Amino acid sequence: MITERQRQILNLIVSLYAKDHTPIGSKSLLDSIQASSATIRNDMKALERLGLIQKEHTSSGRIPSVSGYKYFVENVIQLEEFSQNDLFKVMKAFDGDFYRLSDLFKTAAKSLSELTGLTSFVLNAPQRDQQLVSFEMVILDNHSVLSVITLGTGEVRTNQFILPKSMTEADLAVFSNLVKERLVGKKVIDIHYTLRTEIPQIVQRYFKVTSEVLQLFESIFDDLFKEHLTVAGRKNIFDYATDNLAELYKLFSDDERMLHEIREITNNDEMRAVKFDNDEKFMKNLTIISQKFVIPYRGFGTLTVVGPVEMDYQRTLSVLDLVAKVLTMKLSDYYRYLDGNHYEISK
């Protein structure tokens, strides 16, 4: 446990170091702390013994340690009002109408990346809890069919496929009816179970060649069980990382691994999560910050940034909060549009 003055000193050291990345001495704190230089030095020694600050080899000043940053984020930091300049940039980016959920998420990721200079990610509400609200099949020609899946979030998934040789147009109608009767209205997690238990038995009753029908089910619904991550600023790692660049770029390009990282640190009721101590050695000097945003009546999505341990946390958290608020506002407009008997425009 640290004293209130030590808390103020840690706050100042973190804030000042974030601005110019030079070690902080006791004299730099005199104007802001009501204490003598000797008292401040003693408090700095106490913080150093606790492992919250550390000495820089080339200077007599001190810099925050990883533990210090962690303590600062969890116990000291207070969100400041976002700047008018940041507000203007975010509102300008989100100006206009959005007819695709993916475009909203791309705009959010790009805004986060540009304002923080970090790599950013946007994740929708957990797929397993989403509901399949409608299913349609459109015959394009004698051989091609388009399936259209609509989820409760308004997200539309389309899949064009070649009609199996063993299936007739009448078989296709039976297939469509099976989906509507057995799968529409269920959550994705329940659909996954139904496809592996009930559907194989039902297919045997209605179709002569079951293998191609089951393969068609898998082809249409397989993508439904995969979460999609929106990424911006992958190349920003070259600005804030010096080691293991190839490994980092590979990680940021691997949606499955990043999804695991993000879900792992946000798997609780907290609206914000920060991870400093990463198991991956090549990420030991990086911090992952995630913040949930409200998806009206559908749950919570997640905004995430990855950057150096010595990032400006005050500004980064402020920008995350700003983008989350504006994104939720635009999502409200988007769902009002969808609820007016419109459909998401899908590419």
Swiss-Prot record:
GO biological process assignments: negative regulation of DNA-templated transcription
InterPro entries, sorted: GAF-like_dom_sf, HrcA, HrcA_C, WH-like_DNA-bd_sf, WH_DNA-bd_sf, WHTH_HrcA_DNA-bd, WHTH_transcript_rep_HrcA_IDD
Top-level taxon: Bacteria
Residue intervals passing through the bilayer: none
UniProt xrefs under Pfam families: HrcA, HrcA_DNA-bdg
Listed Gene3D superfamilies: 3.30.450.40, Heat-inducible transcription repressor hrca homolog, domain 3 (3.30.390.60), Winged helix-like DNA-binding domain superfamily/Winged helix DNA-binding domain (1.10.10.10)
The entry's keywords: Repressor, Stress response, Transcription, Transcription regulation
Any GO molecular function: DNA binding
Biological function: Negative regulator of class I heat shock genes (grpE-dnaK-dnaJ and groELS operons). Prevents heat-shock induction of these operons.
PANTHER family: HEAT-INDUCIBLE TRANSCRIPTION REPRESSOR HRCA
Record-stated family: Belongs to the HrcA family.
Protein name (database record): Heat-inducible transcription repressor HrcA
Lineage, broadest ranks: Bacteria, Bacillati, Bacillota, Bacilli, Lactobacillales
